[in-house]
Amino acid sequence: MTDHEKEILDKIKQSTEKTPVPESLAPDQIMKMLEEHNSTQASGHIPKKHGFSRGHRMRGGLIAAALVLVVGIGAHIRQQNLSSDSATSSTKGSSSIGTSSGKLASSDTLETATDYDEVYTYLQSYQDELDSSSVTGSTDSGIVMYSTETADSGARTDSSSSSSDSSTASARAVDTSFSDTNVRTEGVGEADIVKTDGSYLYTLKANSQEISIVDIRSDQMKVVSGISLNENFQASEFYLSDQKLFVLGNMQNTQVDSDSKTLYRGSCTRIQTYDLADINNPKSIGTVDQSGCYRTSRFKDGYLYVFSDYYIYDTITKKDYPSYVPLVGDNLLKQSDIYLPTNHAADQYLVVSSVSASSPDKAADQKAVMSENGEVYVSENNIYIYEYANSSILADNLAAKNQTILRKLSYNKGKLSGSAQGKVKGYLNDSFSIDEYDNTLRLVTTVTHNVGSSSQSNSVYVLDADLKTIGKIEDLAKNEQVYSARFLGDTGYFVTYEQTDPLFSVDFSDPENPKILGKLKIPGFSEYLHFYSDNLLLGIGMDTDENGITNGVKISMFDISDPSDVKEVSKYALDQYYYSDVFSDYRAALVDPEKNLIGFPLSGSANQYVILSYDKDQGFQVQMQEEVNGNSYLGTRGVYANEKFYVINGNAIEAYRMGDYVKIDDLLL
């Protein structure tokens, strides 16, 4: 725990000495969770289904929980110095909103707010419902849980890049052969903690406040320059494109006042852009802030699309618009840019902005979707925001809770526009379980059948462009749950698990009548699927025996040439390793079929990085398995450039010669 965190907790403890609070929100408990999280970061282990999208986000959630506690007992919170004059309310009064608890809206129309008063009513309704249901402490310190994956996935992708694409500049490359970030959707760039252009490595240091630029044109690596961020700016990841670096993360403005009585609160997502034309002297050329904690982003056709979670923790006042309306730049979002929730209340927004790479000092467009907690999947043309209603305090029956709500926004050259909303039964494991193809949306969900019971099954749904269900298969793999999925053209594959690993193949050629083609049962389960060719599907997961006891990380190759008769043609178990970052972040995988290279980090008694190759006769062959130096919670990445392979963790970089993988250099930043 940092001195700054201790200082904040001390102030909270002083403020709460005479005020009873839930045990889970007690300062001592928050301190305990922080220390436990530090230990978790050191081990590198994130439990399945309950991981956080970033280590520093969990810490942010804990501090946010502490801040919520202060607000709850009446601490004085100063808002940003914004004039409500910038908000122009409609002359209409507040809309009439239904107040019957437990019912999700049946409307299939994605509606925008008519005025800020309407937005206020939805937010206040949530708080009223929260108060009346007496569940103020039910979220265990107010930490927001995220899906275990930290980016997205689904269409066939390659990790390698033989030429510059939307998120990688190649102008300086002495060899155009270098790897790129493993992405969810081909053609849609994603940020990461390490990038290369073939000549330089760009890496986020362990403190999340510096980016080092390392010359890799010779065997001996050399730091040529770096970027030091504002001390209150915690970077999460960045993009590299056309000699510009786009850094994304959270700007923290929390501090204890000198009078020891006032706690200042403020946090926003920041997009800061640097010009790399002079590689020895990067220059800041633009900054855009938006309300909320950074969630994720995408890059396509010269535009960044940035997503943040904006939670309404504080007491709000109807006419004090800056207290509850999101900001992008210095401007409050217009009412027409705020999409209303599907039920009668909400406690947060998912804020979406677009920023042009050529004008990085301002937002091109912005929207906000009111919700209770949503995840994001981005296809080539649309953004899908999905949230599982089971967590809702507003749904009091299983039918209302056990469904996923979907909202659809189109995007094109920076322009954002809401287009549809819908719902399906059950919940999505991650964004690999949702895929857009040929104007349809395919989903694989797990459905709970009884309140308080483990009884569940799995379903396949096909939705049209308006998010209306046009095809489905239900009651699959009873008492199991989806662990991974992948789609290729008219065929989908998904893995469920209880003690064995059934790999289902689904025919979507007739969207109104999807059909199960085959089911292969093998021990263990695959957490991540990646197409290795048109006929081969790679799986990375865990090896288990018939009793469900894990034996280590397993890699499998499936022959999918006949989707009705899928076969596991090769497998390799890496025993003594209980986890891989790939399970929660697909960007940790480097899969390049052209180079016959499969690389990913391992966690066990020691942290290692493994590279395997695949041959149809010999199966998997380990080409390299080396211990990883560095202990950054940001994770480990492997990249290649100019026939050299680099393993990066925090401030440590190790270089290997590809082919024999002999170590040729290392560098401590």
Stretches found by the model and what they are:
Residues M1-K6, D10, E35-T99:
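Membrane-interface helical sensory segment of bacterial ECF anti-sigma factor regulators
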Residues L9-K11, T19-N38, R78-L669:
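Beta-sheet-rich non-transmembrane sensory/scaffold domains
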